[in-house]
């Protein structure tokens, strides 16, 4: 959230609610992030001279719970050079709910790669963000028409609550 300013703060509460609903439905929750020092791999932040470890910290309000996977990556996609695809195959995932920073970078790259691996993707509009609203909206439009269902957080939470009720009744 250090690179996306005010837009990032607006996504905190919807993302917190989404995480709670996913956990209640018994779905695996997986985080991706980076370390500031990635053995010489340079990022835009590093080129600007502003890269710090704090830039990549997961905010306390959204912190992983014990047992939730945190995938450390060196590039925009959570899949590139990481064990993410192996883990998703192991847990039998068929669909992914994707959110985070930035819509035009990491969210887009991970969504395109997930689509290429055959996953059905949902990108949650209020739980993604970018440096500019224009960039955010254009990328959501493009992702929706090619690689994912872009949905509102309330719709996704409603589906997750229904799934939780179904699993509880079973």
Feature annotation, model-predicted:
Residues 71, 148-158:
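Short acidic-hydrophobic, aromatic-tinged amphipathic segments that line or gate anion-handling sites
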Residues 97-100, 119-133:
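A short glycine-rich beta-strand->turn/loop micro-motif centered on a GG-aromatic cluster
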Residues 24-27, 92, 118:
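Glycine-centered short loops/turns at secondary-structure junctions
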Residues 59-101:
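Internal catalytic-core helix/loop-beta-alpha segment
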Residues 103-110:
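Short glycine/serine/threonine-rich phosphate/pyrophosphate-binding segments
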Residues 131-145:
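Active-site-proximal loop->helix
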Residues 1-65, 159-170:
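Active-site acidic carboxylates
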